[in-house]
Design a protein with these regions (language model features):
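N-proximal low-complexity "stem/linker" segments adjacent to membrane-targeting elements
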Residues: 1-28
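Short loop->beta transition adjacent to catalytic acidic/histidine clusters or analogous donor-positioning motifs
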Residues: 3-4, 27-38, 55
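Short acidic, S/G/P-rich loop/turn micro-motifs used as interaction or catalytic elements
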Residues: 12-15, 93-97
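Well-ordered, non-membrane alpha-helical segments in soluble/globular domains
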Residues: 19-26, 73, 99-103
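Short, hydrophobic beta-strand segments that form beta-sheet elements in well-ordered domains
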Residues: 35-42, 115-117
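Active-site-proximal specificity loops/subdomain of glycosyltransferases
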Residues: 39-87, 97-98
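Catalytic metal- and UDP-sugar-binding loop of GT-A-like glycosyltransferases, i.e.
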Residues: 90
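Conserved donor-nucleotide/metal-binding helix-loop-beta segment in metal-dependent transferases, i.e.
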Residues: 96-118
Length: 118
C-alpha cells in the first residue's frame, strides 16, 4: 500500500506546451517512492498519458455548470480508489522533488489529521 496518493484533474493534452509541462510534472510524481498517482477526467489525451505512464485513470469526475471538475468529487474518487494513508490533490503542472515523500512522512508524525498547503 503506498503512503501517498497524488490525484489531479489535468487540462487537455492538445496544446503541445501544456502537454509537455503536464507530462513532465506527472512523470516526476511517478519517480517518487511510496506514491500512487490517479488522474481524473475525460480531457483529450488523458487516458493515453495515464496508460503510458502507468497510473490510474478515473474519467467519471463530477463537474460544475462550466465544466470544471468539482473538488468534492475529486476527493471522493481518490478516497474510494486508494488505500493510502495520505491524499494529495495537486495541479498537473507541479513537479515534485525527491524530498516530498519524506516531508509528508515528517508532517504525519506531528499530527494525525492535517492539511498542508503550498
Amino acid at each position: 500500500m503506498p503512503l501517498i496518493t497524488l490525484f489531479s484533474a489535468p487540462k487537455p493534452f492538445t496544446n503541445p506546451h501544456i502537454a509537455m509541462i503536464q507530462r513532465n510534472a506527472i512523470t516526476s510524481w511517478t519517480l517518487l517512492p511510496d506514491v500512487e498517482v490517479i488522474l481524473l477526467g475525460e480531457e483529450t489525451g488523458l487516458a493515453e498519458i495515464a496508460k503510458e505512464l502507468g497510473v490510474k485513470h478515473l474519467p467519471a469526475v463530477a463537474r460544475n455548470a462550466n465544466g470544471t471538475p468539482l473538488i468534492s468529487s475529486m476527493f471522493q474518487l481518490a478516497r474510494e480508489n486508494s488505500n493510502s494513508d495520505l491524499l494529495c490533490i495537486i495541479n498537473a503542472d507541479m513537479i515534485l522533488m525527491p524530498d516530498f515523500v519524506e516531508n509528508a512522512k515528517q508532517a504525519a508524525k506531528l499530527k494525525e489529521r492535517f492539511v498542508l498547503l503550498q
